Amino acid sequence: MTSPVTAILLVDHGSRRAESNALLHDAARRFQQFSGYTIVEPAHMELAQPSIQQAFDTCVTLGADRIIVFPWFLSPGRHWTEDIPQLVREAALRHPHIPWTVTPPFGIHPGLFTAVGDRISTSLRKWETELEMADANPPATAIETCNTKP
């Protein structure tokens, strides 16, 4: 008996900004490399492609026997409890033999605290380096403009 092929579907809201949507596509690629799952697909609830339907179809076409949907959201809310499950339910109608589940979003996962700490440390180091180079007091906007790109 072979192990089932598990696909991961990372779902965000979707944006009119291509750069925002590209972040999820990059996250899917990186998670695939990190996790070892062979099928990791990005999907957007609205405003961008691929839709949840399109990504679900792709997972099945690539050989998925089951699909785990991860909401790429920080906090639980209506998108997690209602919208995403409904959109996945609709997508699954084409593939009634494929079981699926929706995980909780990031929430208060301990790994997030490490990420927050890393971002803060990086910003402080950059800020301190800029101050040393300027050899002056920080301008009023230094904190606001420091490290505005991910």
Identify the residue ranges that each predicted region occupies.
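Active-site-proximal alpha-helix that buttresses catalytic centers in soluble enzyme cores
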Residues: M1-P150
